[in-house]
Amino acid sequence: MKEIQLKGGDVHGIVNVVGSTIARKCGQGVYIHSGPEQAVASTKAFTNMVASLLLFAIRIGRTRNFSREKGQSIIKDFERVPELIENYLANPGPIDEAVELVKDAKSVLFLGRGLSAPVASEGALKL
């Protein structure tokens, strides 16, 4: 962040806590208002940051060649996330099998590339 600012770049923060160090140092950005964090690895803050980045990406895309319809389609799909999570929790399926495989493991390697890389990092942090 410092390096970008030293070179004249703008830094925008996506933060949960008003007045946090990142919020103060950036001076501009978005507050996601996820509520108090119970742990450093806060799932709700991570999820809300991903949602904010999705909206930000759509907004940037609209300034280029991203159609309004495509943006609306992505938002419509994203609005289904709570329903999809509820469906999963009601019937976890093959994830239960994966849990059985790793529940007694001494170590687990999380892999992800592209858009899945931060999710893999978050999973590793939480396990």
Go through the PLM ranges and name each one:
Residues 18, 28-126:
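Active-site phosphate/pyrophosphate-binding segments
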Residues 15:
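H-loop (His-switch) motif in ABC-type P-loop NTPases
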Residues 1-12, 21-25, 32, 63:
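Secondary-structure transition/capping motifs at alpha-helix termini
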